[in-house]
Amino acid sequence: MKTGIVDVGGGLRGIYAAGVFDYCLDRDIHFDLSIGVSAGSANVVSDLAGQRGRNYTFYTEYALRKEYMGARNLLARRSYIDLDYVYGTLSNSGGEYPLDYQAVMENPGEMLVVATNALTGSARYFSKEELSQDRYDMCKASSAIPFVCQPYEVDWMPYFDGALGDPVPVEKAFACGCDRVVVLLTRPADRERGPGKDAFFADRIQRKYPFAAQKLRTRVARYNEGVALSKKYQAEGRVLIVSPDDTCGVDTLTKDRAAMMRLYHKGYRDAEAITAFLAGERAAS
């Protein structure tokens, strides 16, 4: 049986999924395929490296630093989040908390990181084999929130956040041969996602990136469709949705350590359902 896990991201709400992954590492639970979208890309790569607690540190310590995100970055780099600081300065071999690149590559599990081509609006699925030591550009590209960040270039091609191209890539997991898939959401699964500021941000990138802007305008509908599809698969016993019943007040860019810690522990507790699911028990729909 081939198992997969999909982390849809969600900015700093991703600490919920970080709790799920730490539970899995504590219980020696591993997946044959890991797919990360946006902040989910950081979660899956640290999980493949076996670095328990690494994501927790990034969310609860580094994300609070002005170097990580803030108005100063917006003025200096035209991006609110400094992706080079997150996935370079902190994560490179000489950084404060280096990614164990060798462990990632030695892990037999497959990995896909989703980014969105800013020129075409299409999803690109970067594979683990495209990762190289101290060059974690796929994670930067996957996390480049439109308007909040400039698109990130990989091989001279600009990319935006993966959630524009494929917000809930559960179908991709099945297309890759998975039999059972854990879908990590960082919003309550029983609440449809609202439009938020998507239209506002889409208007800001429309002139230069019209296809990406169109994908941004339809992202909410496609996210809700992806969750509905995941629920259908859950009723069939092929998917387990792990999601918080409450986000503890944490939003995409919330800088509240106490709230993030609560959400992390909620994720850790909710992950207990994964053991039974992978053992063949059907998830409650």
Named regions from a protein language model:
Residues 1-37, 45-285:
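Patatin-like phospholipase
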